Amino acid sequence: MAVPKKRTSISKKRIRKNIWKLKGHWAAKKAISLAKSISTGNSKSFFVQQTSNKVLE
């Protein structure tokens, strides 16, 4: 099994952790943006089937 030769420095570990956090942040931001555009009906990249709210009599 491969074993690292030296310990990773604290600064390098912090940089990698921040990059990992930022990827999640941007993914969440894109998801919220898409949800907002779908809810307002302004989405150009996501197709939603519209349902009618007619009352059955």
Swiss-Prot record:
Highest taxon above the source species: Eukaryota
Molecular function (Gene Ontology), one example: structural constituent of ribosome
InterPro entries named among the record's database cross-references: Ribosomal_bL32 (IPR002677), Ribosomal_bL32_plant/cyanobact (IPR044958), Ribosomal_zn-bd (IPR011332)
Keyword Transmembrane on entry: no
BP-aspect Gene Ontology terms: translation
Signal peptide from the UniProt entry: none
Keyword Iron-sulfur: no
SUPFAM superfamilies on file: Zn-binding ribosomal proteins
Entry's Gene Ontology cellular component terms: chloroplast; large ribosomal subunit
Primary location group: plastid
Record's keyword terms, sorted: Chloroplast, Plastid, Ribonucleoprotein, Ribosomal protein
Subcellular location as annotated: Plastid, Chloroplast
Pfam families: Ribosomal_L32p
Family assignment from sequence similarity: Belongs to the bacterial ribosomal protein bL32 family.
Protein name: Large ribosomal subunit protein bL32c
UniProt organism field: Nandina domestica
